[in-house]
Amino acid sequence: MNRRNPDVDASRSAIQSNTTINWISLLLIAGALLMQNAPLRADPSPTPLTIVAFGDSLTAGYMLQPSQSFPAQLQMALEAKGHKVSIVNAGGSGDTTSGGLDRLAWTLQPVPDAIILELGANDALRGIDPAKARSNLDSMLTTLKASNIPVLLAGMKAPNNWGAEYVATFDAIYPDLAAKHGVALYPFFMDGVALNAKLTLPDGLHPTAEGIAEIVKRILPDVEALVQKAQATKAAAKN
């Protein structure tokens, strides 16, 4: 019968233990070297900002292909400038400020990062009391402010056929409310396009695809400022 030598067994255990420790050390060193030499991974792409274009047929793209609408052309213009954005088309043809107020709450689900508010053209065309349009827009801006959503308010101008008093009262709505709520104002959404037969449809009211392109070109700096504000607001909310 073979007897085990305790001293030999102890030596073997020590050798095995030291060997295991040495292998672990080598693996740790090798891993550290690999980490040092490994290329740095780029940060994941930021989630695109969601901007809702909330308006009437001027926003929706009346008689245009979806790709020719204001939201679609605006998104392409912003992406060309390097902005990661998703512009949601929340335009409703025929909408007045009353219609916009009625659907604002569900349009804000989920809450967007910013909104372009373009309403009032149909109020002016129908001769709706400017006080009503003012009240509706005021309520919408109050809701957006309470939700901490950055806003670009796109102004409208009343047609002259309603008389000078109506025009003055209506046109004052947008700068007044922009100042009251501390939001950015683009004075006239149809700037450079209204009354231009080359940039409007035969109805003389709605922009063609080329008309939309002109609107986008003119409003783009203001929307870029809105994007920056939305980014800052989003970053502050995370802290």
Locations of the language-model features?
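Bacterial N-terminal signal peptides
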Residues: 24-36
